[in-house]
């Protein structure tokens, strides 16, 4: 019997076990192109797939890439840049050339110019000791700069294979789907290739007669909010369109709540400016710090707020702010641009979240 594979993740299609990769209801087996249930939910409902990838498997993947002479396409998330970095990437992929795709441009305000974003990404990579061949600012959702991406891949690969790397939720699937449309004859079946030392199947897209593009599996960043929220909350916290900055003037001993997911206390300082960049779904409230715990518990009972049952389950991080503006990033959730010279703040997030 010919194996049928999910055209989203490459898993072998089966309808026997809902908990195993590749599951689809029998009613879907007659379709010409089949997405497994997990890929279908991810594509249509923005629900995350359960990860079957271990850290050891992920490291083996990177080490295997490092042993090859190839072009690495590294996809990062502009909205959560630090949270989307693959730890120790350059240590594992050796001296291979790297093309960076800075995704999710559509989420950031239009007032941020593309060339400034490009320069900022290059500067951030330089601080991490990474010098990519090139950086392209893109939006998978809006098909932004994809012709430029395809041209640069063809320019930089020099006939070599291409490996796409990135953690989950950076938009890798959208990019791969566009690559499929650009390079593949839709009448041909997509092939997969098993990675040495793992049980992982990779989607393989032929680029020409001698080379291919491989989609490496992503891994969850355990320090991102997206790794701990329920599936129903994932679409709630992940922006689906351009974020609208919300500005608050805070005096000392005032607090801001970000639904039930995070809280900032302004503990000391003159009046400060707090500009918040979060999903439009996020309910953001300002209150006096002395009323903050009461407000949290009251709204928790109304199911307005999120995952932590009380503020005591969250960990507090204290910061003294500099004279200039400072961004406070809550990985996988959003960020706050604060201008409160020499002020002091306390940030509450669940333990383990950066």
Which stretches of residues belong to each language-model region?
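Core catalytic machinery and nucleic-acid-binding channels of phosphodiester-processing enzymes
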Residues: 73, 78, 85
């Amino acid at each position: 019997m010919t194996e049928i594979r999910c055209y989203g993740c490459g898993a072998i299609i089966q309808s026997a076990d809902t908990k195993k990769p590749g599951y689809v209801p029998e009613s879907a087996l007659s379709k010409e192109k089949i997405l497994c249930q997990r890929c279908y939910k991810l594509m249509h409902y923005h629900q995350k797939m359960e990860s079957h990838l271990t850290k050891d498997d992920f490291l083996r993947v990177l080490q295997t890439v490092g042993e090859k002479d190839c072009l690495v396409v590294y996809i990062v998330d502009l909205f959560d840049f630090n949270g989307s970095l693959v730890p120790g990437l350059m240590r594992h992929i050796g001296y291979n050339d790297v093309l960076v795709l800075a995704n999710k441009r559509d989420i950031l305000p239009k007032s941020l110019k593309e060339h400034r974003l490009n320069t900022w990404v290059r500067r951030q990579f330089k601080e991490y000791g990474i010098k990519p061949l090139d950086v392209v600012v893109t939006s998978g959702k809006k098909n932004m700069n994809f012709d430029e991406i395809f041209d640069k891949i063809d320019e930089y690969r020099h006939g070599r294979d291409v490996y796409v790397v990135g953690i989950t939720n950076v938009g890798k699937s959208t990019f791969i789907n566009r690559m499929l449309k650009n390079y593949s004859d839709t009448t041909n079946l997509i092939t997969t290739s098993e990675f040495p030392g793992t049980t992982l199947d990779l989607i393989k897209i032929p680029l020409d007669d001698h080379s291919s593009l491989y989609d490496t599996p992503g891994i969850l960043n355990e320090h991102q909010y997206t790794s701990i929220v329920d599936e129903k909350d994932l679409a709630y916290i992940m922006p689906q369109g351009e974020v609208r900055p919300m500005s608050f003037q805070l005096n000392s001993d005032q607090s801001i709540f970000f639904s039930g997911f995070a809280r900032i206390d302004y503990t000391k300082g003159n009046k400060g400016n707090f500009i918040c960049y979060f999903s439009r779904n996020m309910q953001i409230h300002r209150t006096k710090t002395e009323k903050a715990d009461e407000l949290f518990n009251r709204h928790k009972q109304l199911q307005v707020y999120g995952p932590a049952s009380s503020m005591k389950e969250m960990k507090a991080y204290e910061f003294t702010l500099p004279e200039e503006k400072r961004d406070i990033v809550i990985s996988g959730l959003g960020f706050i641009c604060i201008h409160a010279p020499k002020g002091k703040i306390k940030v509450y997030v669940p333990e383990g979240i950066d």
